[in-house]
């Protein structure tokens, strides 16, 4: 059989898997890879082989961490050795899963090849069983679906999808619904909607729109289940969590808060947990809050939540402050040497100033000691 000229092994997909995907698209119009194999052998962008174990259709409840990215700034390239250590460390801290290529990964500053490399590096680092969600935000349906195929090939289990919002005023709710309908219908993996007005020109999906996206018949897979399986609400609305929890059973749809400082408030309203940047810095503490609440130890959970919320205030200014805090704390616990130099934001963005660095260390000192004790 002649090799398809469009097949590109450097993007991390085996030829056998590529051909299977083409056949499935022709016969069903969909590729739901988790329904094809009980396990999947993939070839990463780095040439190594790994196996991806099946995951539940809906992402597991708990704390997910949108991992930050390490760079060699002298060559403006990914520091995959440090990245691998970091992913491996996070996977052993009690987190429910990792988000690769979330906002905090600086995904929009990465090339398509670098995105695939990060996912395949994560899969190799955490093994076949640990859940990975991949951000595939882009400006068009076609771009998003291309990134979705790359993510599936590199070993992701779920997709985290922002609405296309470069043309903010033109991105009304009809456009948003159409976009998610098309993406969900053609996606190789289950889709988690990502609502973050701060990076989407103010585009803010209400709970009714999110529910309509999940219930759209076009999003329903051949197995009868919606391919839209959850939402991350970085808008910070506990009201949306409450309404969505009232609208969907947890086994059908997972509603995640987008920060950890309202984790308990979200859980009380029916959330599945959170996908939170703070978990980069203190993953054990954040996972501990969730675990205490689930065990019914509410007062202890609240006490730790309050301390964590105060510590989190020091990194609310953005990615640069979060990455500096990672360099101070979790990167050291992960055994990464000289992390500070490789955790500056990618150019043209700047590190936080010396004053902010002092504040971060002061405000986070107490929670840092708790993290070490866990």
Predicted regions and their residues:
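Catalytic alpha/beta core domains of metabolic enzymes, predominantly
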Residues: 197-307, 315
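Aromatic (phenylalanine/tyrosine) cluster motif
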Residues: 7, 15-18, 37
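Active-site beta->alpha loop and helix N-cap motifs at the rims of alpha/beta catalytic domains
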Residues: 49, 54-65, 69-202
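Leucine-biased recognition of intrinsically disordered, low-complexity hydrophobic segments
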Residues: 20-24, 30
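Structured C-terminal cap/extension of enzyme domains
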Residues: 264-374
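Short helix-capping segments at alpha-helix termini
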Residues: 124-130, 154-155, 187-189, 216-226, ...
């Amino acid at each position: 059989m002649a090799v398809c000229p469009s097949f590109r092994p450097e993007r991390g997909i085996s030829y056998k898997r590529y051909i299977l995907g083409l056949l499935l698209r022709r016969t069903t119009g969909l590729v739901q890879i988790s329904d094809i194999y009980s396990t999947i052998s993939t070839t990463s962008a780095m040439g190594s082989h790994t196996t991806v174990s099946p995951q539940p259709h809906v992402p597991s409840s708990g704390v997910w961490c949108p991992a930050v990215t390490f760079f060699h700034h002298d060559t403006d390239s990914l520091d995959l050795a440090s990245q691998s250590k970091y992913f491996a460390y996070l996977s052993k801290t009690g987190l429910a899963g990792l988000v690769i290529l979330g906002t905090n990964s600086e995904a929009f500053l990465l090339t398509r090849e670098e995105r695939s490399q990060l996912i395949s590096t994560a899969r190799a680092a955490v093994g076949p069983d640990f859940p990975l969600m991949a951000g595939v935000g882009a400006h068009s349906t076609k771009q998003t679906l291309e990134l979705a195929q790359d993510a599936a090939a590199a070993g992701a289990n779920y997709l985290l999808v922002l609405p296309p919002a470069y043309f903010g005023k033109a991105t009304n709710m009809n456009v948003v619904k159409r976009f998610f309908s098309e993406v969900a219908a053609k996606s190789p993996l289950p889709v988690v909607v990502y609502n973050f007005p701060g990076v989407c020109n103010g585009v803010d999906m209400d709970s009714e729109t999110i529910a309509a996206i999940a219930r759209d018949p076009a999003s329903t897979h051949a197995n009868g289940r919606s391919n839209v399986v959850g939402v991350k609400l970085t808008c910070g609305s506990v009201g949306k969590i409450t309404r969505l929890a009232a609208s969907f059973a947890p086994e059908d749809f997972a509603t995640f808060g987008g920060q950890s400082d309202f984790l308990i408030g979200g859980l009380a309203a029916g959330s599945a947990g959170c996908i939170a940047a703070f978990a980069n810095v203190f993953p054990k503490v954040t996972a501990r809050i969730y675990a205490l609440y689930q065990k019914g130890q509410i007062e202890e959970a609240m006490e730790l939540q309050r301390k964590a919320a105060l510590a989190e205030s020091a990194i609310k200014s953005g990615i640069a402050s979060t990455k500096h805090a990672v360099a101070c704390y979790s990167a050291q616990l992960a055994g990464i040497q000289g992390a500070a130099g490789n955790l500056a934001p990618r150019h043209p963005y700047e590190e936080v100033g010396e004053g902010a660095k002092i504040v971060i260390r002061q405000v986070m000192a107490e929670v840092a000691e708790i993290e070490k004790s866990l």
